[in-house]
C-alpha cells in the first residue's frame, strides 16, 4: 500500500544548525501549502532591505501611518523575490488568499495592502518579498536528511516574537535547544 505523505501546511520548518545554505541557514519557514506536487512557504525571520513604506510607494499606495511606513518587510525566500506575500490573521475575503491554518492566511493581492494603508487591514500581518518552494518530494527528502525540524504553526511566534528570537523560539516549542545540537553522530 503506498504511503500518503502528511501535509505540513500550517507548520513551521526550523532549519537545523547543519543546514548551511546561505538562504536557509537559521531560517524559520511557514509552510502555506504542501501536497504531492510540492510545497510552498515563506520565511518569517529574515529581514529584507526594504520597509513597507518603500514597497507601498513602488505600488503607488499612499499612507500617512508612520509606523506602517517604517515596518520591516521580510525576505520570504528566493522564489518570486519581486512579489509580495502577506501572512495575516484576517479571514475577510481578499482577492487572492489561501487559508494556511487556524487563524493564519496568506494573501498576495493588492487589496490587502491598500486596506493596511487606510488603517483597515488585519490586526496582525507580516509582509514578505518572495517565497520558498520545494518540488515534488524535495521537502520530504530534506526532512529525511535532517535539514529541518517541523513544528506546528504558532501565530504568536509569527506575529509577535522578535525576529532574532524566532529560530530558537520555534524549536523550543517542541523542547529542542538548537544550541545544544551537533551535526554529527557516531561511536566513541
Swiss-Prot record:
Q: List the disulfide bonds.
A: none
A GO cellular component annotated for this chain's UniProt record is: cytosol
Task: Give the SUPFAM superfamilies listed for this entry.
Answer: VC0467-like
The record's annotation in Pfam families points to: DUF179
Similarity comment: family membership: Belongs to the UPF0301 (AlgH) family.
Protein name per its UniProtKB record? UPF0301 protein Smal_0940
